């Protein structure tokens, strides 16, 4: 699942620039967030590997000026790859321990980590989720108020809504988001609701 999301997000960015894929690319990660247990023996290592391959493909141009820059290409890809398992891990804590809906936790954690990536260790904002939507002029009006981070928040929110509609068999409760159902949820079974 981790690699599928990374490949789809890569395809949403240049050189392919198929921006609608950005709305479905995070869905495999949303499924991992919603599951009661992560699949596989070392799921966070697999997430790091998927993140590494994503950044390795995105940053391929770093090696072009001089052969010695290949070291920086690998090192930067390795550093940036840590953000994907960190995202899934923090969102899982919010969903399964704090009872926050995956629809809320996913965009908040993603945007927070994009902000951190833009300000920690030199600030690297390339290939943000909001950058995939530069052609969707109605959506990028959000950037007037919140910049590319706001656009990325909206894209991740929409992806989380789509991911929330998928059945995930082994969530910790019937709500699909990891939180125990509350009053309004019980009354609206069978309909799509954003809040658990």
Predicted regions and their residues:
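Membrane-embedded alpha-helical bundles of multi-pass enzymes
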Residues: 1-174, 184-196
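Intrinsically disordered, low-complexity segments enriched in serine/threonine/proline/glycine
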Residues: 179-183
């Amino acid at each position: 699942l981790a690699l599928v999301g990374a490949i789809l997000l890569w395809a949403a960015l240049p050189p392919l620039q198929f921006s609608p894929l950005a709305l479905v690319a995070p869905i495999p990660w949303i499924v991992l967030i919603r599951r009661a247990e992560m699949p596989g023996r070392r799921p966070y290592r697999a997430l790091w590997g998927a993140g590494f391959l994503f950044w390795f493909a995105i940053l391929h141009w770093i090696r072009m000026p001089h052969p010695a820059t290949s070291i920086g290409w690998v090192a930067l890809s390795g550093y940036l790859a840590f953000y994907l398992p960190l995202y899934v891990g923090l969102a899982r804590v919010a969903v399964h321990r704090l009872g926050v809906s995956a629809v809320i936790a996913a965009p908040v954690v993603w945007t927070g980590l994009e902000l951190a990536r833009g300000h920690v260790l030199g600030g690297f904002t390339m290939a943000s989720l909001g950058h995939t939507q530069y052609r969707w002029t109605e959506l990028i009006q959000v950037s007037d108020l919140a910049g590319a981070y706001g656009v990325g928040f909206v894209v991740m929110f929409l992806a989380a809504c789509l991911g929330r509609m998928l059945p995930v068999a082994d969530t910790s409760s019937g709500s699909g988001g990891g939180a125990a159902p509350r009053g309004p949820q019980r009354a609206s079974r069978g309909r799509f609701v954003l809040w658990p």
